[in-house]
């Protein structure tokens, strides 16, 4: 079972009574056929549910009102099978607070050249019915997506499925609770921000709990529960000699298991699906949570270090969006560079907390090594390299008057040399279009040093995310040129200034 099983998307057909009962009967028949086929063949992440025809203002308004109050409804897909005068949609769209997609399709793929008549033309009017609907969306400044293509086309299936992921993610975000264990890393700017503005814009709440509250739960974990989790570690990872039974770091592994169980219990009891820690606030914990955080991220929790609640929330959102897709998604940090003409590289990592969903190894190494930062006992962690191939890194920043999402398209590569003295998980990548352009654009746009790294999602996913939440996006990819990028930032400043 996945999060998508908790939601459904309503399929709404727009028409009108002008064409008579027989035409509406055929419209309904076509709609039933299309919805059944999409649910059976399109591999959509959640179920489509056909709703009654929308043929009058009252019917349409009732559907939109019901969608708002049905917790299972993630959004609406609208198909204008015939012409549907758009003034009928104004009241409904004005109250709709769920994501909306127009599926610009028609029942037949090919025109019946020899038999086409006006009855056929009146029945199959998506071509101009969709344009009428599009006008009222533009006139009302109604954010909505459009997918054009025949309902049997696999590309259309893929695009509808991607939008569904956004719709479900948006509903999950409205319920998201972010727990901060302690506050920000002292004096750091980009990890701070306006939590009230974030809740207004995205819906997620951010609150702080004392580390002592967590410690109480951690200390209540039984030895039996720890032993069971250690057995899971033994079967899932390659343990170094120091971490095995009778190894001199075995107790550190047991303490890491205690912290993991305590953190998970605390998060479950509070209904949290994202959290932060900071190495400056660990009072009562014997080690910085490393292994615990890595495993919780793999289970779908959002996380970021040093109190960075925006990145923690973004990671959870992207975890939901990517559920069931190939490839992983993780907290990440641009750590250090390799400068080589024509082969500039970025080594990404963090002190400990990189999600094993991006690991290339089937069994990452579980080890315990010294960590000077934090002043605690040596923490347990998983060590691995990252899968190669196309990926993205994304950062959500607070500019005071708006949020900006930065996305850099990257290409992860194999580490050319072993890293015998680097005791943390890592990712190595080439930034698009090149490191000087990418880093300068990122810095000029205010991108954070913390990011969400993903093999599972791509730039199109993040564009949709920005659109569905009505936030600015700054893209850095192979098409980026710094002069044009700077101009776009200036234009955005004016545009969003007018929107205030």
From Swiss-Prot:
Tell me which residues bind Mn(2+): 306, 333, 350, 450
- What family is this? Belongs to the arabinose isomerase family.
A Pfam family hit: AraA_N
Keyword check for Ribosomal protein: no
Q: Which proteins does it associate with, and in what oligomeric form?
A: Homohexamer.
Q: How is the cofactor bound?
A: Binds 1 Mn(2+) ion per subunit.
What chemistry does it catalyse, as a reaction equation? beta-L-arabinopyranose = L-ribulose
Family matches, as CDD domains: L-arabinose_isomerase
| Gene3D superfamilies registered for this protein in UniProt | 3.40.50.10940
Q: Which UniProt keywords apply?
A: Arabinose catabolism, Carbohydrate metabolism, Isomerase, Manganese, Metal-binding
Task: Offer a single GO CC term for the protein.
Answer: cytosol
The superkingdom of the source organism is Bacteria
User: One GO BP annotation here?
Assistant: L-arabinose catabolic process to xylulose 5-phosphate
Q: Under what name is this protein listed?
A: L-arabinose isomerase
What Enzyme Commission number(s) does the record list for this chain? 5.3.1.4
Biological role stated in the UniProt entry: Catalyzes the conversion of L-arabinose to L-ribulose.
- Cofactor(s) the record lists: Mn(2+)
GO MF, one annotated term: manganese ion binding
Judged by the first EC level, this protein's enzyme class is isomerase
Its pathway, per UniProt, is: Carbohydrate degradation; L-arabinose degradation via L-ribulose; D-xylulose 5-phosphate from L-arabinose (bacterial route): step 1/3
- Keyword Metal-binding (UniProt): yes
């Amino acid at each position: 079972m996945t999060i998508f099983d908790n939601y459904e998307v309503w399929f709404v057909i727009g028409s009108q009574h002008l064409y008579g009962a027989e035409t509406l009967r055929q419209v309904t028949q076509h709609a039933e056929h299309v919805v059944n086929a999409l649910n059976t063949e399109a591999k959509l992440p959640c179920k489509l549910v056909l709703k009654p025809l929308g043929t009058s203002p009252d019917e349409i308004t009732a559907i939109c009102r019901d969608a708002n109050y049905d917790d299972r409804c993630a959004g609406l897909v609208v198909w204008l099978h015939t012409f549907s005068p758009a003034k009928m949609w104004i009241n409904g769209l004005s109250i709709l607070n769920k994501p909306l997609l127009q599926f610009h399709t028609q029942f037949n793929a090919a025109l019946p050249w020899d038999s086409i008549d006006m009855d056929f033309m009146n029945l199959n009017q998506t071509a101009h019915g969709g344009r009428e609907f599009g006008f009222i969306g533009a006139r009302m400044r109604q954010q909505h997506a459009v997918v054009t293509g025949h309902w049997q086309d696999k590309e259309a299936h893929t695009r509808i499925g991607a939008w569904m992921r956004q719709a479900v993610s948006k509903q999950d975000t409205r319920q998201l609770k972010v727990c901060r264990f302690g506050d920000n890393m002292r004096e750091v700017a980009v990890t701070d921000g306006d939590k009230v503005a974030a809740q207004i814009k995205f819906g997620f709440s951010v609150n702080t709990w004392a580390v002592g509250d967590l410690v109480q739960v951690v200390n209540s974990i039984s030895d039996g529960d720890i032993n069971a989790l250690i057995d899971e570690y033994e079967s899932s990872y390659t343990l170094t000699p120091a971490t095995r039974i009778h190894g001199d770091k075995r107790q550190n592994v047991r303490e890491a298991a205690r912290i993991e169980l305590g953190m998970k219990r605390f998060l479950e009891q509070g209904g949290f699906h994202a959290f932060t820690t900071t190495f400056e606030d660990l009072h009562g914990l014997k080690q910085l949570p490393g292994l615990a955080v890595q495993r919780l991220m793999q289970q779908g929790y959002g996380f970021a270090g040093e109190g960075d609640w925006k990145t923690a929330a973004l990671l959870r959102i992207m975890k939901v969006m990517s559920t069931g897709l190939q490839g992983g998604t993780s907290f990440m940090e641009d750590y250090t560079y390799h400068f080589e003409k024509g082969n500039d590289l970025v080594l990404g990592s963090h002190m400990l907390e990189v999600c094993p969903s991006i690991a290339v190894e089937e069994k990452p190494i579980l080890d315990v090594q010294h960590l000077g930062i934090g002043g605690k006992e040596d923490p347990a962690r998983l060590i691995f390299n990252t899968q190669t191939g196309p990926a993205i890194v994304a950062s959500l920043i607070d500019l005071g008057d708006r949020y900006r999402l930065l996305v850099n398209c990257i290409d992860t590569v194999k580490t050319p040399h072993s890293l015998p003295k680097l005791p943390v998980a890592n990712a190595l990548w080439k930034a698009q279009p090149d490191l000087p352009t990418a880093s300068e654009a990122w810095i000029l746009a205010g991108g954070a040093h913390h990011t969400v790294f993903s093999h599972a999602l791509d730039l199109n996913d993040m564009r949709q995310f920005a659109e569905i939440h009505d936030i600015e996006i700054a893209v850095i990819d192979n098409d980026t040129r710094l002069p044009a990028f700077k101009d776009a930032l200036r234009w955005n400043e004016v545009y969003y200034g007018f929107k205030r």
